């Protein structure tokens, strides 16, 4: 660990020699070990263990990572607490992500915040099928499917499930199925995401990591779209052009 980095605690800390870690970073291993992978770039940040930061991942200055797993080739900023973020996901800006699970290729817009605690301090319920189930957990954030995206200023209530390739705007107080553009939170009408558009958007995102979409990946996206069609129908969305009012 470079001498300019502040180290706290006695649990093991591993920083790959190819990592670029900035002066002023704090690594607090009091509560658990810390791993920082190859060719990662750590701006002036606080990392509180246990924590894992994968290879090629960039932490923006003044990020706070606590008790979390960050996958490979991610772009991370703001506050992350007790969460799992898989590969190629962007959360580059300020905003809070807590007690949540985030899939691959997700883009979380600036000032997006997940609630993970009810104002009543009661346990969080989730909808499973047609029923609401008490999780027995008092701190529970959201579950983001692969390729989902949030606009700036999105606020997501406790225990929400966000589908694959879904786009979110505004306040989210219920689950959102896959391939839905959710505009209800800003006064717009929800719409079904056209699968060809979703594939186009995903190809653009992959190109920013110098990755070409395989034919198998494209087929997978189409298959998931077909598999989740009933969910969208039951949700009341239909194919239409989405507009922001």
Where are these regions (language model features)?
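Tight coil/turn sites that cap or link beta-strands
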Residues: 18, 24, 39, 56, ...
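Transmembrane beta-barrel architecture of outer membranes
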Residues: 22, 43, 60, 69-71
């Amino acid at each position: 660990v470079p001498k300019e980095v502040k180290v706290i605690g006695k649990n093991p800390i591993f920083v790959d020699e190819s990592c670029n870690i900035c002066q002023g970073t704090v690594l607090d291993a009091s509560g658990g070990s810390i791993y920082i992978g190859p060719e990662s770039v750590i701006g002036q940040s606080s990392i509180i263990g246990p924590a894992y930061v994968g290879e090629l991942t960039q932490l923006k200055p003044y990020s706070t990572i606590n008790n979390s797993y960050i996958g490979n080739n991610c772009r991370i900023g703001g506050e992350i607490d007790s969460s799992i973020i898989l590969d190629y996901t962007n959360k580059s800006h300020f905003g809070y992500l807590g007690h949540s699970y985030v899939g691959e290729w997700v883009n979380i817009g600036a000032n997006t915040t997940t609630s993970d605690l009810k104002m009543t301090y009661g346990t969080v319920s989730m909808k499973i099928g047609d029923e609401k189930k008490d999780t027995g957990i008092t701190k529970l954030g959201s579950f983001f499917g692969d390729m989902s995206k949030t606009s700036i200023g999105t606020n997501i209530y406790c225990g929400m499930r966000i589908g694959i390739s879904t786009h979110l705007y505004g306040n989210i107080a219920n689950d959102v199925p896959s391939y839905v553009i959710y505009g209800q939170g800003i006064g717009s009408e929800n719409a079904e995401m056209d699968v060809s558009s979703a594939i186009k958007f995903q190809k653009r995102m992959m190109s920013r990591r110098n990755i070409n979409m395989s034919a198998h990946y494209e087929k997978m996206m189409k298959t998931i779209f077909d598999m989740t069609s009933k969910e969208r129908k039951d949700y009341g969305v239909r194919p239409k052009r989405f507009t922001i009012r």
